[in-house]
């Protein structure tokens, strides 16, 4: 049977204490809503997102990343709350899976289990060791009898450890029957989706529980929750890649975003940070190095190196305290203390310590092109735009301001002046 997915993302998220919409806060490089839609698309091609607070900002982001997502603006003035969120939706399929926009850890393989259960309502349940503060889900004979808030529970009900995880599968006819009957007769004056449980039970509908893992169904309501969710996702990402053969030294100190990919045999040392759409192929990333939106192939990076976006590094050694930005390096050695930005450097070239590509004049960025088998001496400044042909030797301390032809030596130094006995005269010593 086909089914629809509805994602509730209309909430204000005041506990996040941020001007950014809650569902756009990132986990492992992507907003929470991205993770949820990505998993939902694995099980359904009919996805609707319910919006209200900062709706246009959220909608704009989703439309940029995904095709075919429908949007409904909640009538929050007249129908606030989770029950009000579903009032104006046309359901095209016979089953509707309702997800929350602040549950980025949910996985498609778990959601598929909802569909396999034959019931009018499938209610997600978490078994908690300490359910204090949560309403309890009372189950008898494999059926949900009712949900009771902690303040209303008796001693027997308080002993129950089952709590509502907040994800539901409804049959279409049930929603059409009971959504109009919801009332806002409560302290918050909101329409609650959970009230449908009691209405359905009164009319003899079947309500089945599905026990789900807590670490997938934890909501993110604060920056603390956000940090905890990222820890869980980091563990998933690193576990996956280690199972694929990536070596990670002290993996708890390594940070890998969700779009990072590995090929071949790779090793990451402690403190490595990999961000964005980065590809690491048959390479060794040494301690405390950062790679962002770049490709590293058959290379050694670090320790303490920074590879900034749009860099392509192949068969190269990038050493400690070297920064590379928007550059292509093929067969290059840059051992230490250099900045290589907007540069193309070919094989066999050695970059000495303290080399700087001066790529910005205050108004625009310019290219530095270095050919094959070039030796760049320490403390060299390359004033872009500039082109260095093959087989060039650049002496230490040189400032290169014009193109250098093949096979040449480039040197620019102030002559060394030695003043004898100056130390003694300056300090007044004999």
From Swiss-Prot:
Keywords: Acyltransferase, Cell shape, Cell wall biogenesis/degradation, Cytoplasm, Magnesium, Metal-binding, Multifunctional enzyme, Nucleotidyltransferase, Peptidoglycan synthesis, Repeat, Transferase. It comes from the Bacteria. GO terms for molecular function: glucosamine-1-phosphate N-acetyltransferase activity; magnesium ion binding; UDP-N-acetylglucosamine diphosphorylase activity. Its EC number is 2.7.7.23, 2.3.1.157. Its main location: cytoplasm. InterPro entries: Bifunctional_GlmU, GlmU-like, GlmU_C_LbH, Hexapep, Hexapep_transf_CS, MobA-like_NTP_Trfase, Nucleotide-diphossugar_trans, Trimer_LpxA-like_sf. Acetyl-CoA binds at residues 353, 359-360, 378, 396, 413. Binds 1 Mg(2+) ion per subunit. One of its GO terms (biological process) is UDP-N-acetylglucosamine biosynthetic process. One of its GO terms (cellular component) is membrane. Its cofactor is Mg(2+). Mg(2+) binds at residues 102, 221. In the N-terminal section; belongs to the N-acetylglucosamine-1-phosphate uridyltransferase family. HAMAP family: GlmU. This is Bifunctional protein GlmU.
């Amino acid at each position: 049977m086909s089914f629809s997915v509805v994602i509730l993302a209309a909430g204000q998220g005041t506990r996040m204490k941020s001007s950014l919409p809650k569902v756009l806060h990132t986990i492992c490089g992507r907003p929470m809503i991205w993770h949820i839609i990505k998993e939902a698309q694995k099980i359904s091609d009919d996805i609707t997102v319910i919006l209200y607070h900062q709706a246009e900002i959220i909608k704009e982001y989703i439309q940029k990343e995904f095709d075919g997502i429908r949007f409904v603006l909640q009538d929050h003035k007249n129908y606030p709350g989770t029950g009000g969120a579903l009032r104006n939706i046309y359901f095209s399929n016979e089953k509707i899976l309702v997800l929350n926009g602040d549950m980025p850890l949910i996985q498609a393989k778990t959601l598929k289990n909802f569909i396999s259960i034959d019931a009018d309502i499938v209610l997600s349940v978490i078994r908690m060791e300490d359910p204090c503060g949560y309403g309890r889900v009372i189950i008898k004979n494999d059926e949900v009898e009712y949900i009771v808030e902690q303040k209303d529970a008796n001693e027997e009900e308080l002993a129950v450890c089952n709590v509502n995880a907040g994800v539901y599968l409804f049959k279409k006819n049930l929603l059409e029957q009971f959504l109009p009957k919801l009332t806002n007769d409560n302290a918050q004056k909101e329409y609650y989706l959970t009230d449908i449980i009691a209405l359905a039970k009164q009319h003899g509908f079947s309500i089945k529980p599905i026990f789900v893992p807590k670490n997938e169904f934890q909501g993110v309501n604060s920056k603390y929750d956000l940090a905890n969710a990222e820890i869980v996702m980091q563990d998933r990402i690193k576990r996956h890649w280690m199972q694929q053969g990536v070596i990670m030294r002290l993996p708890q100190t390594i940070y890998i975003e969700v779009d990072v990919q590995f090929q071949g045999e790779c090793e990451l040392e402690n403190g490595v940070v990999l961000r964005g759409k980065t590809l690491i192929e048959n390479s060794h990333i040494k301690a405390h190095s950062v790679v962002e939106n770049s490709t590293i192939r058959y290379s050694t990076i670090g320790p303490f190196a920074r590879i900034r976006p749009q860099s392509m590094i192949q068969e190269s050694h990038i050493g400690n305290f070297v920064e590379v930005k928007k550059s292509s390096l093929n067969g290059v050695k840059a051992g230490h203390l250099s900045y290589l930005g907007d540069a193309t450097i070919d094989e066999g070239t050695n970059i000495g310590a303290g080399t700087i590509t001066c790529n910005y004049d205050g108004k625009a960025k310019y290219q530095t092109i270095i050919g094959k088998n070039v030796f760049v001496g320490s403390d060299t400044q390359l004033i872009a735009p500039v082109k260095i042909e093959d087989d060039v030797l650049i002496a230490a301390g040189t400032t290169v301001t014009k193109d250098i032809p093949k096979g040449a030596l480039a040197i620019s130094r102030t002559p060394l002046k030695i003043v004898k006995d100056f130390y003694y005269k300056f300090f007044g010593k004999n």
